[in-house]
């Protein structure tokens, strides 16, 4: 992918920052999605996908009015057709600013205040609807919508994705491309109507700091043509030194496969490992019915992939 201009991207990324301890929404920074979509020939008013960006934060804390700290997990989601994304370091600084802020008499009041403020601030920043939920005592929650590990299953058919590096002979394959190279992808006739692939070898780098981001990628393809799985793995590995945000990586994978295969249905989901207490999980699909409802549902927290 093309190198993008980062000169105006953030007042925080790549710089030393003081950690504010009191609630400060001015810390939040947004980035237009168009800065990456243009070179992928994606138009905001005619996207070939639907989906969402899901964020999970594991170290969010604030104080009660008598000074007692409470900790919670925060999950929030917003749609991929929003004009902006939130820049990750600014988000981490923003949620850290709750840490010494007194927000209520009880745990419930504290968490409700975090939810209310974060929904308002993020929705205004991104000019879209952001849904925020807070969770505590996760291991005591009995809801079947919570703490379920189903990422490697197609929700409708309950069929597993095939982990490419564990299934196909790759010992003699030479991997030497570490910048995104869609020419690696090879089209083959589909022997079965649906192909489901997974790899735990996704790695990319932050667009500004070049810090590494590792994750799992899941690909669902339905159509007369599919992609050779080893070539798909080669392509996934080629992101290893690619400097782009998580959302941009997911959209690049989706767009390359969409253009190449012209499938009936396509879904790409990237579950990145947490860094700085947060993980980012973008998903793009050709129709809403293909989306993992649990991922885009802010009220549902799942057991993660091992690295998350």
Regions found by a protein language model. Give the residues of each.
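N-terminal intrinsically disordered, cationic/polar leader segments
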Residues: 1-308
């Amino acid at each position: 992918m093309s190198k993008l201009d980062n000169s105006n991207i953030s007042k925080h990324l790549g710089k030393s920052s003081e950690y504010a301890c009191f609630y400060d929404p001015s810390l939040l920074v947004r980035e237009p999605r168009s800065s990456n979509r243009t070179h992928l020939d994606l138009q905001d008013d005619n996207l070939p996908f639907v989906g969402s960006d899901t964020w999970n934060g594991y170290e969010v804390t604030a104080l009660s009015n008598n000074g007692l700290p409470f900790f919670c997990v925060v999950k929030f989601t917003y749609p991929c057709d929003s004009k902006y994304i939130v820049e990750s370091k600014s988000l981490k600084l923003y949620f850290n600013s709750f840490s010494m802020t007194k927000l209520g008499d009880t745990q419930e009041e504290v968490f409700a205040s975090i939810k209310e403020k974060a929904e308002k601030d993020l929705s205004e920043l991104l000019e879209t609807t952001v849904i925020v939920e807070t969770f505590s005592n996760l291991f005591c929650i009995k809801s079947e919508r919570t703490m379920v590990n189903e990422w490697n299953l197609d929700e409708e058919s309950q069929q597993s994705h095939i982990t490419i590096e564990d299934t196909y002979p790759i010992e003699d394959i030479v991997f030497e491309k570490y910048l995104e190279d869609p020419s690696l992808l090879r089209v083959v006739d589909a022997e079965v109507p649906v192909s489901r692939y997974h790899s735990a070898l996704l790695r990319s780098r932050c667009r500004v700091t070049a810090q590494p981001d590792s994750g799992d990628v899941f690909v669902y393809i339905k159509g007369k043509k599919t992609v050779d799985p080893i070539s798909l793995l080669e392509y996934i590995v080629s992101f290893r030194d690619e400097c782009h945000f998580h959302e941009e990586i997911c959209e690049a994978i989706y767009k390359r496969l969409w253009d190449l295969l012209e499938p009936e249905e396509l879904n790409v989901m990237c579950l990145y490992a947490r860094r700085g207490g947060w993980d980012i999980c973008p998903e793009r699909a050709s129709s809403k019915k293909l989306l993992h409802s649990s991922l885009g549902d802010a009220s549902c927290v799942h057991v993660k992939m091992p690295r998350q």
